[in-house]
Amino acid sequence: FESLPVKPDITICVFGYLGENETARAHWQEAEKIIHSNYTGAVSILNVVSNFYAKQQKGTIVGISSVAGERGRQSNYIYGSAKAGFTAYLSGLRNRLFREGVHVVSIQPGFVYTRMTEGLSLPPLLTAKPEQVAEAVYRAIEKKINVVYVKWFWRWIMLIIKCIPEFIFKKMKL
């Protein structure tokens, strides 16, 4: 970032690695790859960007996180925990940078048709196209929205999932 001749006014952090949950449970290297891809890598980049924007007292940071980070589920809890950390990071960054004139956006897309989800059996109604994610990002930047669920119903789906008492939730196969 430091070596760029012209710094961007908007930084969009959009990368992720779902990984193999079963492999990650058995082999730390896979878990580490998931964590570094979804949390450590993003934070290392955005720390540099956020400090620059804070000094400039302007800029926009967009982080693509995941609804998977809103509640740990057996099917992807390592990926979900990394995204939970990233979502919390974005929230803290937003809190820190608001008074500096920097806008921080968290995008919670739900399922998206990408290379990362190729081969997965995704429910079409719940799955966004990359163009829908791009439109949501653009709208959030233009309207200074803080948290965006690409498909509106994900906000309510996750609210319901988060409200399930733990003694019931732990018995569910999600």
Where are the model-predicted features located?
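Conserved mid-core segment of classical short-chain dehydrogenase/reductases
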Residues: 10, 16-32, 75
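Active-site helix of classical SDR
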Residues: 46, 82
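Residue(s) in the substrate-gating loop at a strand-loop-helix junction
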Residues: 66
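Active-site-adjacent segment of SDR/Rossmann-fold oxidoreductases
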Residues: 71, 92-103
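Active-site loop-to-helix junction immediately N-terminal to the catalytic Tyr of the SDR YXXXK motif
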Residues: 72-80, 92, 120
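C-terminal helical subdomain
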Residues: 106, 122-157
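Short, flexible catalytic-loop segment of classical short-chain dehydrogenase/reductase
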Residues: 109-119
